[in-house]
Amino acid sequence: MLKSYYGNPTKDMKLVAITGTTGKVAVAHYVHEILKASGEQVAVLASDQPFKMGMLHKFLSDAWKAGANVVIVTVPAGSLRENVFYGLPITVAAMTNFTTASLSDMTPEEYLECEKTLFDMKPEMVVLNHDDVNYETFAAFKGTKKTLDYGQTGSFVKVLNSKLYPRGTEATMSVGGEIISEATFMPGEMAVSYMACASAIAAALGVVSEHIVDGIAEYMPEE
């Protein structure tokens, strides 16, 4: 019914879906800024809280009407449990991490089962955190076109070194074999992982390194 009401806007847009227990919102905003820097017409729906199917489809419809050609959406496990994303064509599905300490409303087993539903939707490209302790579990998830990884142990995006400051973070990474230096106003070690994830997503979408660096620098996290 929602599809008949809102139409099928995703047929004209690339859909980037970002999931994981932490960092979804930060990565979504990083990717949003990167794609804006590259000249794409992009819209973002980012929240750690689950949202309803009606809200998602209205967002997609509004983004399409506004001329977006890429949409970025965070994917809480609770929304996957309610089949909110059922039937949507996913261009990129990315996993930030799986931290059991962050789970409050489901068991680790239930969470993994929810996450599996996203990657079972046959996304064109899958981006995974090679540093995550549960990487071997998620390594079974494959994109129909390509599967990429990131992290200090990553092969596609490899974190070479980083510097942490009270009000920001710098990192040097190899992205598809090209060495780039990134800087963000987000402090903390996790910022390095989130930048790496966003860089992998952007590179998967064909964004050049200059725009990745510019977009990362543009994101201003809330205090």
Each language-model region and where it sits:
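Adenine nucleotide phosphate-binding catalytic loops in nucleotide-utilizing enzymes
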Residues: 105-112, 116, 144-223
